[in-house]
Amino acid sequence: MKLGSKQVKIISLLLLDTVFFGIEITTGYLSHSLALIADSFHMLNDIISLVVALWAVNVAKNRNPDSTYTYGWKRAEILGALINAVFLIALCVSILIEALQRIIAPPVIENPKFVLYVGVAGLISNTVGLFLFHDNDQEHGHGHGHSHGGIFADHEMHMPSSHTHTHAHVDGIENTTPMDSTDNISEIMPNAIVDSFMNENTRLLTPENASKTPSYSTSSHTIASGGNYTEHNKRKRSLNMHGVFLHVLGDALGNIGVMLSAFFIWKTDYSWKYYTDPLVSLIITGIIFSSALPLSCKASKILLQATPSTLSGDQVEGDLLKIPGIIAIHDFHIWNLTESIFIASLHIQLDISPEQFTDLAKIVRSKLHRYGIHSATLQPEFITREVTSTERAGDSQGDHLQNDPLSLRPKTYGTGISGSTCLIDDAANCNTADCLEDH
């Protein structure tokens, strides 16, 4: 475990919070301070969250894929982030209820000076935690642009011919991919799934791989002004570590609120001064909730395998349909394995020979690479008749094919449907409704 790793940071904060929890609960009972006792249980909530985060990091790092968990435990951190977000939301609800009770019947704080001192000590503790996790929360990758003038429109099938590929950084454009992380996709998925993997810092077509490139000739496969750029706003931060950061931030804000209300109660004689404590608590609760809810939504979307928020499935599909030889795309799925690893699977209907598929698949993969998708499963479906140029130019659900046998096309998203023209649907897919009825 190297210094500065996630585990070291979490363990450091865990030890600090445990010590402070003992101090708070002891002094709270000795001084009969309900506020301190309540804050100590708030600290206990953070300790539990840190334990969950530490478990998630260790499991994700040390558990390898096996026959039961074929992707490994990489999503353990996503699960940890969701658990932490739920803890935060539950904590916000409990603070809200307590604050409303204190507004109705505000308690008298007999020793505000002592509460102020404890608040200062707690703020110092949480400031250390903020410094520990600030870098994880704000870390962003650098920009790296990939663009292909003409969107492969000038590619023609020639076997063999030369193929050139130029990468460049473009001023003013931050076109990044989400794979600049310590995760190695080849360690997560078996070689049968991932033939090879290039991260964004690696030239897609390196000299040693040049002989393996698609034999498609091109006149405009270079970076050019006016090319089609796809922006990916990459964030390297881990949702799990972001959840820990929000816990620490919530504690720090809570301690600031305790200090402000204690100081106000200590130094003023207003009859309404005791209302400051619950009112400040409500404001802080709103801030914490506004951060915890998006965290839970992000983690939930990943677990539900939604399309990554930085991508448009329709845009990716439209880009792929411009590749000569592709007629239609269906059963198209894009999802996150983790925050930084995108995966795709799709069926593509083709009007090329099976011998040409490998070369076309490499073009498809390079397209997906530009969008940050570095692992894709392609299911080819070869059309056995000649396809007209009008059909080739159409989209995956073109209306101009209504009188053609291919007009009954399956939907781009979802799975194959009964009666569709998915050429391998009957062989590869079950009719889900019928199967469930049989069982």
UniProtKB/Swiss-Prot annotation:
Residues on Cytoplasmic side: 1-9, 55-76, 135-244, 296-439
Histidine repeat 1, short sequence motif: residues: 140-144
Record-linked SUPFAM superfamilies: Cation efflux protein cytoplasmic domain-like (SSF160240), Cation efflux protein transmembrane domain-like (SSF161111)
Membrane topology, Vacuolar segments: 31-33, 98-113, 266-274
GO MF, one annotated term: zinc ion transmembrane transporter activity
Transmembrane intervals: 10-30, 34-54, 77-97, 114-134, 245-265, 275-295
Extent of Polar residues compositional bias: 207-230
Post-translational modification Phosphoserine, affected residues: 225
Membrane topology designation: Multi-pass membrane protein
One Pfam family it belongs to: Cation_efflux
Main location per the UniProt record: membrane
Disruption phenotype: Reduces zinc transport into the vacuole and hence limit the over-accumulation of zinc caused by the deletion of ZRT3.
Cross-link (Glycyl lysine isopeptide (Lys-Gly) (interchain with G-Cter in ubiquitin)): 301
Ranges for region Disordered: 207-231, 388-408
Positions of short motif Histidine repeat 3: 219-223
One GO BP annotation of this record: intracellular zinc ion homeostasis
UniProt-listed InterPro entries: Cation_efflux (IPR002524), Cation_efflux_CTD_sf (IPR036837), Cation_efflux_TMD_sf (IPR027469)
Family: Belongs to the cation diffusion facilitator (CDF) transporter (TC 2.A.4) family. SLC30A subfamily.
Name used for this protein in its record: Vacuolar zinc transporter COT1
Record organism: Saccharomyces cerevisiae (strain ATCC 204508 / S288c)
Classification lineage: Eukaryota, Fungi, Dikarya, Ascomycota, Saccharomycotina
